[in-house]
């Protein structure tokens, strides 16, 4: 898998987790909202680190 493909995959994953966080926020399940946001930030940071290489 090329670095560009991995970067796109990481961005898609972080986007999915952001959507999940919004869904849990609407259901007022704030613990899962925080967990999903943390995972999304983690994937986003990894994708950005891959960008800088």
Curated annotation (Swiss-Prot):
Superkingdom: Bacteria
Which residue ranges traverse the bilayer? Answer: 8-28, 30-50
Q: Name one GO cellular component term.
A: plasma membrane
The alphabetical list of record keywords is:
Antibiotic biosynthesis, Bacteriocin biosynthesis, Bacteriocin immunity, Cell membrane, Membrane, Transmembrane, Transmembrane helix
UniProt-listed GO biological process terms: bacteriocin biosynthetic process; bacteriocin immunity
User: What topology does the record note for this protein and the membrane?
Assistant: Multi-pass membrane protein
Induction per UniProt is: Transcription is highly induced by oxygen limitation and is under dual and independent control of Spo0A-AbrB and ResDE.
Query: Is the keyword Membrane assigned to this protein?
Result: yes
Localization:
Cell membrane
Q: What does this gene product do?
A: Involved in the production of the bacteriocin subtilosin. Required for maximal production and for optimal immunity to subtilosin.
What this protein is called in its record is Antilisterial bacteriocin subtilosin biosynthesis protein AlbB
